[in-house]
Design a protein with these regions (language model features):
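Acidic, surface-exposed loops and disordered segments
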Residues: 4-183
């Protein structure tokens, strides 16, 4: 069957996945500090989204951040989720932007500021691509932290998640707090 023979609703899922792939390319080609590329990008769908949601719900009991419940429910409205993360690598500038005077004085586990900035620029490029193609997104720290817990982006010390959807109304805004996992 040709795509022109399909209803828009039938073709929408394929379109969203294609946009997500373009978002991944935009993240990859985004400028990087010192030209060093240590970001990782991945796409999850279907059962992986459910697994991510379940992990977010489980994390609430550990840390008490109730907004994880809302976000865990919210990502189930996504057709896919783009994950963008960075490995930890000192860039050797001794700039102090991370809070330490020198790179050698930086405590292990504290990301180099350039690593964090690179993730932010990659996220901006990915979301701009989605906006240009009229697809809805929202950057989620909560889902990114759960993806990091699942180790889906190997060795990444900071991960953000971007759920992606194309529907009549953006499901990622005007969200109501969710008090319990089953409500």
């Amino acid at each position: 069957m040709c795509i022109r023979d399909r209803n828009e609703r039938d073709a929408r899922h394929e379109h969203v996945l294609q946009v997500a792939r373009q978002m991944m390319t935009a993240a990859r080609t985004a400028p990087k500090g010192k030209g060093i590329d240590i970001i990782e990008v991945a796409l999850i769908t279907d059962e992986e989204i459910k697994q991510l949601s379940d992990t977010m719900i489980a994390m609430v009991e550990e840390h008490g951040m109730k907004f994880f419940l809302r976000d865990a429910d919210n990502i189930l409205s996504a057709e896919c989720v783009v994950l963008i993360g960075t490995r930890e690598q000192t860039q050797g500038l001794n700039c102090g932007h991370c809070g330490f005077t020198t790179c050698d004085g930086r405590t292990e586990g504290v990301p180099c500021a350039l690593n964090s900035i690179d993730v932010g620029i990659a996220i901006g490029s990915a979301c701009a691509t989605a906006a240009d193609l009229r697809v809805d997104t929202r950057v989620m720290f909560s889902a990114g932290l759960a993806a990091q817990r699942l180790n889906w982006l190997k060795d990444c010390k900071m991960v953000m998640a971007i759920p992606v959807s194309a529907s009549s109304k953006n499901p990622f805004f005007d969200r109501k707090p969710k008090q319990e996992a089953n409500s």
